[in-house]
Regions:
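Conserved beta-loop-beta/alpha segment of the NTase-like Rossmann-fold superfamily
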Residues: 95-98, 102-154
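Basic polycationic patches enriched in arginine
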Residues: 6-7
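Intrinsically disordered, low-complexity segments enriched in small/polar residues
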Residues: 16-18, 50, 92, 121, ...
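Residue-level recognition of conserved structural "scaffold" positions that shape functional pockets
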Residues: 16, 41-43, 130, 151
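N-terminal glycine-rich phosphate-binding loop and ensuing alpha1 helix
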Residues: 21-89, 96-98, 137
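Short, Lys/Arg-enriched N-terminal segments with co-localized hydrophobic residues
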Residues: 11-22
Length: 154
């Protein structure tokens, strides 16, 4: 069937289709469960900017400017208190939703077990899997202690 201008106009004015074209803001998934064994502390929380800003503050600022609507931190339970106290929506001017998920050794897909001598987190893929329940749209993944620059979020 050949589309005519009138048919196209009718097609795009259907109310049920309007819901499908809603702009979805992406989520920024921040991998922050590592301890920084060579560094000796949580370097993702250390201030480096002129007013004590952490590297992650710059990354989230750039993501907000690019239209991101939510940031999810992948952390370990061991660091939960510190992260919840520092990384609040108010820290970012209320311009982005903040959530936390946990990367723990025993959070594995069914049928997998933790080897007795395993003490380190499983890595990037495992960390991303931890956010599956809180991300339901487009997302980008970054490391908390790396600086990417504004262009990375466009």
């Amino acid at each position: 069937m050949k589309l005519t201008p009138r048919r196209t106009e009718l097609f795009f004015s259907l109310p049920e289709l309007e819901k499908e074209f809603v702009m979805v803001k992406p989520t920024l998934l921040v991998l922050a469960a590592g301890m920084g064994s060579r560094y000796g502390s949580l370097k993702q929380m250390d201030g480096v900017g002129p007013s004590g800003e952490a590297i992650i503050d710059y990354s989230i600022y750039d993501a907000i400017r690019a239209g991101f609507g939510k940031v999810v931190f992948v952390i370990r339970h061991l660091f939960e208190k510190e992260f919840r106290e520092i990384f609040t929506p108010e820290r970012f001017g209320g311009k982005i939703e903040v959530d936390f998920v946990f990367q723990e050794l025993d959070k594995l897909p069914e049928g997998f077990t933790v080897p007795a001598d395993r003490v380190k987190p499983w890595g990037t893929n495992h960390a991303v899997m931890m956010a599956a329940e809180v991300i339901d749209g487009p997302f980008a993944v970054i490391n908390a202690d790396d600086f990417y620059g504004r262009e990375a979020y466009q």
